[in-house]
């Protein structure tokens, strides 16, 4: 039995990516939901304030989803998330998903994420807005919420080629790998409000999401 601890925010796509990699590898792990306002446990464990952070069996805590994925694949190589012949393409796709696609999905999901933190309390909601507006500028949250339809249309435009790609394959490159987990994490933005908001007409993408979502230690990912 492994002894791993994942420090996370539930709504973080990068944490969702790491959780699903841990599931795929059949590893036992404990999840610590970090309080958005009080990160002292995360700071004590990792020396920094960013999630995801993963405490390994050695007691070392590492941060950054790319680094975590690489270390996990080195420590627990079977099953691999980096098929040798496709490693570079998986990394390139993951960077795109965690960059341009993340920006589009984050903006499309902002109303749901604001509502999530509002449910946690006024202090959480205020701090969430403060962090976002410190990064993107004053008024960012209100402006982005008003532009929600345009943000969702942009997200759908970026997802459409992925839906087409998945018409003849179970996973992005045929065999499941890191890019699938990165995309899965980002699409979590579209489920923050509860129901999955991948358009109904994107049947291939919705089916792919279901396949990845069902992965647990006992599941054959090829099914």
Each predicted region: which residue ranges?
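GST-like domain detector, emphasizing the conserved glutathione-binding G-site
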Residues: 1-127
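Alpha-helix C-caps/helix-loop-beta hinges
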Residues: 51, 78, 168-169, 184, ...
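GST-like fold's C-terminal all-alpha helical module
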Residues: 99-207
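Intrinsically disordered, low-complexity polar regions and short flexible loop motifs
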Residues: 206-214
């Amino acid at each position: 039995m492994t002894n791993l601890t994942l420090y996370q925010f539930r709504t973080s796509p990068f944490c969702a990516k790491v959780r699903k990699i841990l599931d795929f590898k059949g590893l036992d792990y404990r999840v610590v939901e970090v309080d958005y306002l009080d990160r002292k446990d995360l700071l004590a464990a990792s020396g920094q304030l960013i999630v995801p952070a993963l405490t390994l069996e050695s007691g070392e805590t590492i941060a950054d989803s790319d680094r975590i994925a690489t270390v996990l694949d080195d420590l627990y190589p079977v099953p691999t998330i980096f098929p040798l012949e496709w490693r570079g393409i998986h990394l390139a796709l993951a960077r795109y998903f965690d960059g341009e696609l993340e920006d589009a999905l984050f903006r499309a999901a902002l109303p749901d994420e604001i509502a999530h933190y509002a449910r946690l309390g006024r202090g959480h909601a205020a701090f969430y807005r403060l962090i976002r507006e410190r990064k993107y500028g004053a008024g960012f949250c209100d402006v982005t919420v008003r532009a929600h339809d345009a943000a969702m249309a942009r997200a759908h435009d970026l997802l459409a080629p992925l839906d087409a790609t998945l018409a003849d394959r179970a996973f992005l490159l045929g065999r499941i790998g890191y890019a699938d987990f990165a995309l899965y994490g980002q699409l979590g933005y579209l489920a923050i409000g509860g129901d999955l908001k991948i358009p109904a007409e994107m049947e291939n993408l919705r089916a792919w999401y279901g396949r990845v979502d069902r992965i647990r230690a006992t599941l054959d990912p090829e099914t």
